[in-house]
């Protein structure tokens, strides 16, 4: 049995979609916080079990009979370390033999503040005695494209990444890699630095938005403090705004760049380009 935490989340549902191509539904366990959101998974024959990252006992119960676990990092930045400890402890108690974990690109040397909890989780895995693999994911293209509608409306894309190169890929690309690692043999003990095949700057993103929309969009680089303040002014929670601003500054220092093409090698095809992602965005919104 293969289990996925956060199975109905933004990455998790793509992982299950990819897994279903090669693994029978009867061998997949979706661990979810809210089973009501997993009715479609249950209808496909997938086992749905309820457990919250904060409830070690429920996680231990949910992991009974599971051999392999994909630990998708919690969405609660600042609470990730204790929550991941719960999952790892539960996996150990339930007899899970292998864990794949979605970490952060070059976590051990990353300038991003986000790296701290990932490094802590990686150490927990090393100390757990369970065989594991690290999926050090780079940035999701969707992270930046979420700001595209506002940029098109105002003609300005704001950020604090300077000329930093961002080797992003889509969630579906990263999910395909996770599905392969969790379902195939031979990946145990590996550390995969995963990122898109081609890197781009926010100036290039603005140019691509201009090209495909016909509306002029320029990139305006802000200081970390000013970018965080701008995000808060449109309603983002303080913690999220500060994290995004810190990540942009990290990108300016090379924190979101990698040119190894490990991701495309792992999934067997090129990663989704920026132009393709922008095109998809417009098709969905139209």
UniProtKB/Swiss-Prot annotation:
It catalyses: a quinone + NADH + H(+) = a quinol + NAD(+); a quinone + NADPH + H(+) = a quinol + NADP(+). The gene is qorB. It comes from the Bacteria. Belongs to the NmrA-type oxidoreductase family. This is Quinone oxidoreductase 2. GO terms for molecular function: NADH:ubiquinone reductase (non-electrogenic) activity; NADPH dehydrogenase (quinone) activity; oxidoreductase activity, acting on NAD(P)H, quinone or similar compound as acceptor. PANTHER family: NMRA-LIKE DOMAIN-CONTAINING PROTEIN (PTHR47129:SF1), QUINONE OXIDOREDUCTASE 2 (PTHR47129). GO terms for cellular component: cytosol. NADP(+) binds at residues 6-11, 33, 73-75, 138-143, 171.
């Amino acid at each position: 049995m293969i289990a996925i935490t956060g199975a109905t989340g933004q990455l998790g549902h793509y992982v299950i979609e990819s897994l279903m191509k090669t693994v029978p539904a009867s061998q997949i366990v979706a661990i979810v916080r809210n089973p009501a959101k997993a009715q479609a998974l249950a209808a496909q024959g997938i086992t749905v079990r309820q457990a919250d990252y904060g409830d070690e006992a429920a996680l231990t119960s949910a992991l009974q009979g599971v051999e392999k676990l994909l630990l998708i990092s919690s969405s609660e930045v600042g609470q990730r370390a204790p929550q991941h400890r719960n999952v790892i402890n539960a996996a150990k108690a339930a007899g899970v033999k292998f864990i794949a974990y979605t970490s952060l690109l070059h976590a051990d040397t990353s300038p991003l503040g986000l790296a701290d909890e990932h490094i802590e989780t990686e150490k927990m895995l090393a100390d757990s005695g369970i065989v594991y693999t690290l999926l050090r994911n780079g940035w999701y293209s969707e992270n930046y494209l979420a700001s595209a509608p506002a940029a098109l409306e105002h003609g300005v894309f704001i950020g604090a990444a300077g000329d930093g190169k961002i080797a992003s890929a889509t969630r579906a690309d990263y999910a395909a890699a996770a599905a392969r690692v969790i379902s195939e043999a031979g990946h145990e003990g590996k550390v995969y630095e995963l990122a898109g095949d081609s890197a781009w700057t926010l100036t290039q993103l603005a140019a691509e938005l201009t090209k495909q929309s016909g509306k002029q969009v320029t990139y305006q680089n802000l200081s970390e403090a000013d970018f965080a303040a701008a995000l808060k002014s449109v309603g983002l929670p303080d913690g999220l705004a500060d994290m995004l601003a810190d990540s942009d500054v990290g990108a300016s220092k090379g924190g979101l760049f990698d040119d190894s093409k490990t991701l495309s090698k792992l999934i067997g095809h090129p990663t989704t380009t920026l132009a393709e992602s922008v095109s998809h965005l417009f098709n969905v919104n139209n």
